[in-house]
């Protein structure tokens, strides 16, 4: 193992992989470390991503596309379904990936670009000098070592331990940490071309339940509920088990995962001296959908681009790295995150009766676009009083 690099990347998910590939292609010496023994496992994601968004970063490949989705459905507590076909659903209809293969492909591309990839290596603490991050102390297959770098990109997922140890505030309020559970199920009867989202406080309080098909009568069936709603007998797994017993009584569960997804605002600042934070660690998960693959790839790539310029200029201070933070906040992604956070804060206050009323009002509508923005516009069109309740969003809905 070498001990000095231009850029050290912590985490082998989509954010880390795109950062490593981009940084290596720019001519930097790059090391990507991953704490697990294998890239892409365990899968901690529903595995969905919009088609156009994916194509911004990688050419789709049948090897890691489990299903090509034709429509999306939102199903209210009383069963009213809002169905969006592919020609109107835009970026929300897309692919269901096989993350085990997809993540490995991304890291493989980073390695081909010249990045060193080291698995079973955990960053235990930042190397700090005069208040700046200068690398990481690691345990590699149980052996301690130091890896020094001009810039560290922390892409270590929801836990965001490295950024916290470097002094950034990464705490997520309990109510904004979704408690999630997911089963990979087979031998179930589903619409193989539709991603389904179920709403309702009896189904998934302050969250939603999803069914994402993966072909051959197989699907990811999962749920996310507010952390403050999770308690004995009412955990995410309990709600999921009840849904499965009712809807897929003869299905077979071949894999189960559990975890948390932050649906808060992004970190107040995603840079420090010698440090950048990307992906889920930066809290750039969509607050409504909980999706984060595309945002992770975007922030990982952007972090590497800015880091490369700073290294070339010989200045990796917080001030020099700040264009990364400013650019993603000013981007379409940053705008959507802020708007969707406000929408999420409103919708978690609704009871099932209000959810049913809103769904029924647009169930037969022909939406011009299927996105959170398109959905809110149509809801306001059908329910004008809603604009008063969403007055904080007025300027973003034009």
Curated annotation (Swiss-Prot):
Gene3D superfamilies per UniProt: D-Amino Acid Oxidase, subunit A, domain 2, FAD/NAD(P)-binding domain
Gene Ontology molecular function, alphabetical: flavin adenine dinucleotide binding; geranylgeranyl reductase activity; oxidoreductase activity, acting on the CH-CH group of donors, iron-sulfur protein as acceptor; oxidoreductase activity, acting on the CH-CH group of donors, NAD or NADP as acceptor
Record's keyword terms, sorted: FAD, Flavoprotein, Lipid biosynthesis, Lipid metabolism, Oxidoreductase, Phospholipid biosynthesis, Phospholipid metabolism
Alphabetical list of Pfam families matching this protein: FAD_oxidored (PF12831), GGR_cat (PF22578)
Pathway the protein acts in: Membrane lipid metabolism; glycerophospholipid metabolism
Gene Ontology CC: membrane
E.C. number: 1.3.7.11
GO biological process, alphabetically ordered: glycerophospholipid biosynthetic process; membrane lipid biosynthetic process
Catalytic activity: a 2,3-bis-O-phytanyl-sn-glycerol 1-phospholipid + 8 oxidized 2[4Fe-4S]-[ferredoxin] = a 2,3-bis-O-(geranylgeranyl)-sn-glycerol 1-phospholipid + 8 reduced 2[4Fe-4S]-[ferredoxin] + 16 H(+); 2,3-bis-O-(phytanyl)-sn-glycerol 1-phosphate + 8 oxidized 2[4Fe-4S]-[ferredoxin] = 2,3-bis-O-(geranylgeranyl)-sn-glycerol 1-phosphate + 8 reduced 2[4Fe-4S]-[ferredoxin] + 16 H(+); a 2,3-bis-O-phytanyl-sn-glycerol 1-phospholipid + 8 A = a 2,3-bis-O-(geranylgeranyl)-sn-glycerol 1-phospholipid + 8 AH2; CDP-2,3-bis-O-(geranylgeranyl)-sn-glycerol + 8 AH2 = CDP-2,3-bis-O-(phytanyl)-sn-glycerol + 8 A
Other comments on record: Reduction reaction proceeds via syn addition of hydrogen for double bonds.
Name used for this protein in its record: Digeranylgeranylglycerophospholipid reductase
């Amino acid at each position: 193992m070498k001990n000095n690099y231009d850029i050290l990347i912590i985490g082998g998910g989509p954010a880390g992989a795109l950062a490593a590939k981009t940084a290596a292609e720019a001519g930097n010496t790059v090391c990507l470390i991953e704490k697990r023994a294998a890239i892409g496992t365990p899968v901690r994601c529903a595995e969905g991503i919009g088609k156009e968004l994916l194509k911004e970063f990688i050419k789709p490949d049948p090897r890691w596309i489990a299903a090509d989705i034709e429509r999306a459905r939102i199903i209210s507590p009383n069963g009213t379904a809002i169905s969006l076909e592919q020609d109107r659903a835009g970026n929300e209809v897309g692919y269901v990936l096989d993350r085990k293969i997809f993540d490995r492909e991304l890291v493989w591309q980073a390695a081909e670009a010249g990045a060193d990839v080291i698995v079973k290596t955990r960053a235990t603490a930042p190397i700090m000098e005069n208040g700046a991050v200068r690398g990481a102390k690691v345990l590699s297959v149980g052996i301690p070592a130091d890896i020094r770098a001009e810039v560290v990109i922390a892409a270590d997922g929801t836990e965001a331990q490295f950024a916290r140890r470097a002094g950034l505030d990464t705490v997520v309020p309990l109510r904004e940490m979704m408690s999630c559970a997911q089963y990979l199920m087979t031998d179930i009867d589903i619409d193989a071309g539709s991603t389904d989202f179920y709403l309702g406080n009896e189904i998934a309080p302050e969250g939603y339940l999803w069914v994402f098909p993966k072909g051959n009568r197989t699907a990811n069936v999962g749920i996310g509920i507010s952390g403050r709603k999770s308690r004995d007998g009412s955990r995410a797994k309990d709600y999921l088990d009840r849904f499965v017993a009712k809807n897929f009584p003869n299905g077979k569960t071949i894999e189960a995962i559990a975890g948390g997804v932050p649906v808060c605002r992004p970190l107040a600042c995603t840079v420090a001296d010698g440090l950048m934070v990307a992906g889920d660690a930066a809290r750039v998960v969509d607050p409504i959908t909980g999706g984060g693959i595309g945002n992770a790839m975007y922030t990982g790539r952007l972090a590497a681009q800015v880091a490369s310029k700073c290294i070339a200029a010989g200045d990796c201070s917080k001030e020099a790295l700040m264009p990364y933070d400013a650019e993603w906040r000013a981007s379409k992604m940053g705008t959507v995150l802020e708007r969707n956070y406000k929408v999420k804060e409103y919708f978690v206050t609704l009871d099932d009766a209000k959810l049913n009323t809103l769904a029924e009002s647009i169930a037969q509508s022909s939406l011009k676009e299927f996105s959170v923005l398109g959905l809110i516009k149509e809801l306001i069109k059908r329910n004008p009083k809603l604009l008063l309740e969403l007055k904080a969003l007025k300027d973003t809905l034009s």
